[in-house]
Amino acid sequence: LNPDVLLFKDTIDNLINEAKQLRNFAIISSISDNKEFPNFSIKKKRHIDYKKNFEVDCVDGYCMLINKKKIKSMFKDNIFFDEKIFMYLENDDLCKRVKEQNEKIFIVPTSKIKHLGARGVSNNFHSEVELSRNWHWSWSKFYYSKKHKGYLYALAEGLPKLVSSMIKFFFYCIIFKKFKSKVYYNRALGLINSMLNRSSWYRPKID
């Protein structure tokens, strides 16, 4: 549970009660109250009955209840989250590995949450956090694609994004938009580091 998540009165109780009822699950999650940005994904579109628990392919990492016993039986090395990923897509990676083991992931509609996201960050640190977010998103996206689809696929997917980021970086430099230029510079830098198999080393400067 991330610190930028707000709970409703029965969020935890309903989630735990449903976990006891379901039993046969690897991961379950509460449901976001923001329907425009759901905290789950389903590969094959289908009608969803929001009055009962439903199975999904992936849930966002800011609220997950893991069936530790089942997960440990699946991953003998006891590595749940990929520790090479500092930020972004670690939940996608875990969910993908869970589904590859034919295990189940559920959303519990009676357990609601509100995700604040960037709104949970102090204005004093907003710029540094935004730069960090852009760096790590680019790094993690390439790493995830490389891990699950291969280096060449990740490269073909990443090179156009690298070119786009560099063009935007130079454009914003020319028109003296300093912060915007830094954003796209960090996007490019995160991607380049991932392409070169370097670690996700970047950290925001919030001293």
Task: For each feature predicted by the language model, list its residue ranges.
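Hydrophobic/aromatic residue at the end of a short beta strand that borders the catalytic acidic motif
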Residues: 1, 5-11, 66, 81
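Generic structural signal for small/hydrophobic residues in well-ordered secondary structure
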Residues: 2-3, 28, 67, 98, ...
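Conserved donor NDP-sugar-binding/catalytic core segment of glycosyltransferases
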Residues: 5-40
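Short, flexible, basic/aromatic active-site loop/helix in glycosyltransferases
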Residues: 30, 34-65, 69-70
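Short glycine/proline- and charge-enriched loop/turn segments
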Residues: 44-51, 77-79, 119-128
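A short, conserved alpha-helix in the catalytic core of glycosyltransferases
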Residues: 58-75, 79-112
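Active-site donor/metal-binding and catalytic loop motifs
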Residues: 106-128, 141
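Non-catalytic, C-terminal membrane-associated alpha-helical segments of glycosyltransferases
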Residues: 132-140, 151-207
